Amino acid sequence: MSKIEEAKKKASETAVEDWLQLSVAFDGADEVDESLTLIKGGGGCLLQEKIVASSAANFIVLVDERKCSKKLGTQWTKGLPIEVVPMAVKPVQIRIKEVLGGDPLLRPAGTKMGPQLTDNGNFLLDWHFDPQANYDWRKVEDTLLHMPGVVETGLFIGMTRKVYVGNLDGSTRVLGE
């Protein structure tokens, strides 16, 4: 076993209790709206990122100004990431279209054949929704999470109280408290 494989094995065996009480966690986001609701998961690691964010007393987000929007879906146009167990992809796609509309597309792997796998071995759907519609994101998330086969969504609602924004001119600003 290589050193990298050993490190990965050790990290995967680390008990959540060992790091469950983080005082602060920092991360980026794919998009943040005016109410500090985030879309994350563009890189495919949304479940584990949500576990870390929810385990931190303070979850602080860092973005550049191009990721800020009045409404979700206007800057990040690649869809809302949804982690789904492989056998449920088709039923979940059909259900999303029936209940929420839009177009939930299976995310392809970038450098190999087939769909992209999450770190947990699941597939990702990218739900392309109407960015002009007025969504209650808590209801959307609840609807998605109650679909059999959906593991997690890329919606991070009420998880951060502060977003640090780097502006293109080099200045910074803080959204939130």
Task: Give, region by region, the residue ranges found by the protein language model.
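Conserved phosphate- and dinucleotide-binding cores of soluble alpha/beta proteins
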Residues: 2-10, 22-177
